[in-house]
């Protein structure tokens, strides 16, 4: 479960769903990265979506432009705040394809605010994309989750030092050309929630 950055709609084939991000509070138990939500707390209109992840006590707000996404996560609980960044995830036909659809991946942590990289994936078609992920607050700890057999991309668990009611904003830029193109998208296609 989480929020990915791109989707195909109505094509009849699985693909995209790249860079899954999930905010949560508390300790990790059995790697259960999922939460219930209540429909009455969902809000949606063109260019905006919000929902409360009730198990985690996190309010999620999302918006996007053509090549960027912006997330704002408000952590309501007095528990450790985390964000899972899953670079292996994607939309696939069968669960076992989750481990093999990424055929090459590179990722670099620039500082405590930025992650950059590229993935080469094959599902419906073979494609390569580049990304820049920026946080408005520094993460204080990072853990790389153990990959399953055949996986090429990383799953990162970032921890943040937040008080109840504080938020973290995450901006994601995408490009099919270069990391610089993803960075340029973030600079040119500025959006706010």
List PLM regions with ranges.
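Accessory carbohydrate-recognition regions in carbohydrate-active enzymes
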Residues: 1-193
């Amino acid at each position: 479960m989480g929020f990915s950055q791109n989707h195909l709609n109505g094509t009849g084939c699985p693909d995209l769903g790249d860079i899954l991000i999930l905010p949560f509070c508390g300790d990790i138990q059995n790697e259960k990265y999922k939460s219930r939500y209540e429909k009455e707390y969902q809000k949606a209109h063109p260019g905006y979506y919000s929902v409360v992840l009730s198990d985690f006590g996190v309010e999620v707000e999302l918006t996007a432009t053509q090549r960027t996404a912006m997330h704002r996560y408000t952590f309501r609980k007095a528990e450790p705040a985390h964000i899972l960044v899953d670079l292996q995830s994607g939309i696939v036909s069968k669960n076992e394809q989750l481990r093999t659809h990424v055929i090459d991946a590179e990722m670099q942590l620039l500082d405590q605010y930025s992650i950059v990289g590229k993935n080469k994936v094959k599902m419906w078609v073979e494609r390569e994309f580049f990304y820049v992920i920026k946080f408005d607050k520094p993460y204080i700890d990072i853990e790389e989750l153990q990959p399953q057999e055949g996986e090429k991309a990383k799953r990162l668990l970032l921890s943040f030092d937040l008080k109840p009611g504080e938020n973290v904003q995450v901006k994601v830029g995408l490009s099919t050309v270069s990391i610089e193109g993803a960075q340029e998208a973030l600079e040119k296609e500025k959006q706010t929630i």
